[in-house]
UniProtKB/Swiss-Prot annotation:
GO terms for biological process: cell surface receptor signaling pathway. The keyword ATP-binding applies. The lineage of its organism: Eukaryota, Viridiplantae, Streptophyta, Embryophyta, Tracheophyta. This is Non-functional pseudokinase ZRK15. GO terms for molecular function: ATP binding; protein kinase activity. Interacts with RPP13L4/ZAR1. Belongs to the protein kinase superfamily. Ser/Thr protein kinase family. ZRK subfamily. It comes from the Eukaryota. Disulfide bonds: none annotated. PROSITE patterns: PROTEIN_KINASE_DOM. Signal peptide: none annotated. SUPFAM superfamilies: Protein kinase-like (PK-like) (SSF56112).
């Protein structure tokens, strides 16, 4: 009778999965209506068995990203679609770090809803579908090759870091301007930026914590229980008052720019005191030259830096300071993206495609 017990167990598991999928489908529909006015693009719903087959049961050999600092961020796996009638053969599969619950289900469904409407933009991952049946919900993206998580220790080229900054600024600007109700990304993390192995394009993912700003308003105020994120990237108005606006993203991006130029270790050496935002600015002024600020790994890769490129790095720092509010009015992300695009264009034309 052992075979009968196994058959009964499989039937129970299948029934539980179907119930979970049905319940979560309702939550997803509510989030699509709430966040996207019901206009999300159609996506494929994968079964749990299809996901297990695509990832070889989430094998370690298929994992793209590891845990960061022992904090359980989302796990990414490469996978193959074995359906010969489906166009997307290579897949990137994101296994959500938490089990789906009444408390966090809205975040997961928001990730799906917003991912679906930004999929056509080159600086976002293209969403193929999702799996609502699994205990840990899953998102499925199209992948040309195996993408990698952004690791500043591996990205040592100045031009590549400049390109990443321009592409993420463009992604944030798109969220702020492309929809009737602007989206604020809110919680920027290096772990949510993936690099396409085929062309090195930086892509922003994970919209779990996005906030939409009502039409005619410039901010929303969150309750204390909703305030969260990486402390480095949180401006005081958000951290203390729960105010979320486009400036929330500008601040986080300004910190991201500084980490791109300095590297994580040097950033924390210069910017350890968040009680005084001028700490970095003052320390930078005491530095004798740009060499004392820029990531040493990147400088080693560059070799001799031209005076023109040093000036461009200085301008990059100044732009980051504007984003975090140290130099007058905080710029819109559209302006930041345009400025970075100019930096990138000037760097390419003046230095060619080799030295940096």
């Amino acid at each position: 009778m052992e075979w009968w017990k196994k058959k009964s167990l499989r039937a129970i598991i299948k029934r539980e999965r179907l119930v979970r999928g049905h319940e979560r489908g309702g939550t997803l529909l509510e989030e699509i209506i709430k966040s996207c006015n019901g206009k999300a693009n159609p996506i494929k719903i994968f079964s749990a068995d299809q996901i297990l087959e695509a990832t070889d049961t989430f094998s370690e050999s298929n994992r793209v990203s590891e845990l960061f600092d022992e904090i359980p961020y989302d796990w990414y796996y490469s996978g193959k679609n074995n359906n010969h009638h489906h166009h997307h053969k290579l897949l990137l599969i994101k296994k959500w770090r938490y089990r789906f619950s009444e408390h966090n289900g809205g975040n997961f469904c928001r990730d799906i809803a917003i991912s679906s409407i930004v999929s056509g933009h080159k600086n976002f991952m293209q969403l193929v579908g999702c799996c609502l049946e699994s205990e840990h919900p899953v998102l499925v993206y199209r992948a040309s090759k195996k993408p990698t998580s952004l690791d500043l220790k591996m990205v040592v080229s100045w031009r590549q870091r400049l390109k990443i900054a321009e592409e993420i600024a463009t992604a944030l600007a798109y969220l702020h301007t492309a929809f009737p109700r602007p989206f604020v990304y809110r919680i920027l993390r290096l772990e949510d930026i993936l690099l396409d192995d085929e062309d090195g394009v930086a892509k922003l993912c994970n919209f779990s914590y996005c906030v939409s700003i009502p039409q005619g308003e410039t901010f929303v105020k969150l309750g204390n229980g909703c305030i969260g994120g990486d402390y480095d990237y949180m401006d005081d108005n958000y951290l203390i008052n729960g105010i979320v606006s486009e400036k929330t993203d500008a601040f986080g991006f300004g910190i991201f720019m500084q980490k791109l130029l300095m590297g994580e270790e040097r950033f924390h050496e210069l910017c350890y005191d968040r009680s005084d935002l001028t700490t970095f600015e003052n320390r930078r002024k005491f530095a004798k030259c740009i060499d004392e600020i820029v990531d040493s790994n990147m400088l080693e890769k560059i070799g001799d830096v031209t005076e023109e490129e040093r000036c461009r790095m200085e301008a990059f720092i100044v732009l980051s300071e504007r984003c975090i509010g140290l130099r007058g009015e905080v710029p819109k992300m559209v302006e930041v993206a345009k400025e970075l695009k100019r930096f990138l264009r000037d760097s390419s034309s003046s230095c060619g495609e080799t030295s940096l």
